[in-house]
Regions:
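Nucleotide-sugar donor-binding catalytic core of glycosyltransferases
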Residues: 1-31, 35-39, 46-54, 70-203, ...
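Short beta-strand/loop segments at the ligand-binding rim of alpha/beta enzyme cores
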Residues: 58-69
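A short acidic/histidine/glycine-rich donor-binding loop in glycosyltransferase catalytic cores
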Residues: 230
Length: 230
């Protein structure tokens, strides 16, 4: 509603609070209270989307509160507001681990139901799906290069405002279901990964390529520092 939008604007502008984050925290606490039993461990992923007060309440219901962040403080500075709310914190971003004394943990592959099709029957040579941001010019240049070499590709960009246009890119303004993304991944020979500015942590796409035994093209040079790099 208009009232909630105005209220949320005031909270964020003057009190550095987000109404959605407060709501998420309250809803999680409701579920925790239903269990009515102290937990050995509570693991919170993307804790920057929950208000610090709720996270501190989580700690009353567990022996240990652990957080994992698959975004970095450069892109999501609110992570810094909740760092002190956990007993133990893991991050996929090495720079954040060094700067804030966090523990390092990579991302993972969670698409356990994805099947990898035969390379000879794959519809696309190269596939990428991403959100609209500063990576778009790089993606466009790669698309132009692949097209000039007659290499088949499927590049999809989620653009909520649907303002961008490029003949080599498919733009969508609603989130694509994970099952549909998995179909595109399965039906492609090579996955393309373009890391965000200020990010060196490896994305999920890297681990999907490992799990599905697909080739990977990435702009992230830090990949050479991992033990699986060849």
């Amino acid at each position: 509603s208009l009232f909630h939008k105005a209220y949320n604007f005031i909270l964020k502008s003057f009190f550095r609070k987000n109404l959605k984050h407060i709501y998420y925290g309250k809803e999680i606490l409701k579920e925790i209270n239903k269990i009515n039993k102290k937990q050995d461990v509570i693991i919170t992923i993307k804790g920057d989307f929950i208000d610090p007060k709720s996270i501190l309440e989580f700690k009353k219901h567990t022996k240990k509160s652990i957080a994992f962040f698959n975004d970095n403080t450069y892109r999501c500075p609110k992570i810094k507001q909740v760092i002190d709310c956990f007993d133990e914190i893991y991050s996929f971003e090495k720079k954040d681990c060094e700067k804030f004394n966090l523990k390092f943990a990579t991302n993972w592959i969670y698409n356990i139901t994805v099947s990898s099709c035969n390379k000879n029957t794959a519809e696309y040579d190269v596939f990428n799906i991403s959100s609209i941001d500063k990576r778009q010019p790089i993606l466009i240049r790669i698309a132009e290069e692949l097209k000039s070499k007659k290499i088949n590709f499927n590049f999809i960009i989620y653009d909520k405002k649907h303002k961008s246009t490029n003949n080599n890119i498919t733009y969508i303004n609603t989130h694509m279901p994970l099952s549909e993304v998995n179909e595109h991944i399965s039906n492609s020979k090579v996955l393309l990964d373009i890391n965000r500015i200020g990010q060196v942590g490896l994305t999920f796409r890297v681990f999907e390529s490992l799990g599905l035994e697909k080739k990977l093209i990435t702009t992230n040079s830090d990949i050479k520092n991992y033990d699986f790099y060849n």
